[in-house]
Amino acid sequence: EKDNTNAHICLLAKTEEGRRPLNDALSEANLTGFYGRPRVDIPLLLSLPRDDLWVTTACVAYWQYPDIDDITRRLADHFGSNFFLEVQAHNTDKQVMLNQHILELHAKTGIPLVMGCDSHYILEEDAQIRSDFLLSKGMNYPDEEGWYMDYPDGETVYERFARQGVLTHSQIVEAMENTNRFLAVEEYDGHREPPFTGRGGDLGILQSE
C-alpha cells in the first residue's frame, strides 16, 4: 500500500559550513530518498552540523506523524538552542489546537518558541492574484478560511496572536523576538561557486552550438 505521508520542516543555514551540508542533504534526498517527491529522513537530518543551522517545526504540516513529539525531542537534542517550536497566528481551530499542544511541549522540554508566517503573498489585496494563479494551474485548496497568507508587520502579528487567544503576552513577545536570532548570518562578498570553464575548458564549443 502506498504511503504518501510527508511532513514539513524549516532548515536555515547560518554559515557556509551549514549551507554546503544542507545542499548535500537535498541532493541526497533527490538521489536516494525520492518517493513521490524528494524526502529527507531523520538520520539525514541528524547528520547535519548542529551549530551551523537553524531549524524550526514550520507549519501544521510538520506534525503529520504519530510519533512526531519523539522526533521533535530527538531533533532538539541534536540541534540544541538552534531548534525552535514554531507558532503561527492563523484564526483556525486546527492552528489553535496545535499552538496549545506546542505550548505543552514547550513547557515540558524548554524548546524555545519562534513566530512564523505562512506567507504566500505580501499584501492582503494580493490574495486574488494568487487565487487566479492557482486556478490557472487547476489547483484548489478548499480549507483556507481563517488562514493568513500575507506578510504582516509586527503589530499585526501581535494583534492576530492576541485574537487567537492561546499565547500569553510574554509568549507572543518571546516568539516574535526570537525571529531576530536569524539575522546573525555569515556575510561574505563574492561568489562561492566553482569556476565554470565550459566543456573541455573551451567556451567556443558552447558558443558554436
Language-model segments: residues:
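Phosphodiester-processing cores and adjacent nucleic acid-binding clamps
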Residues: 1-209
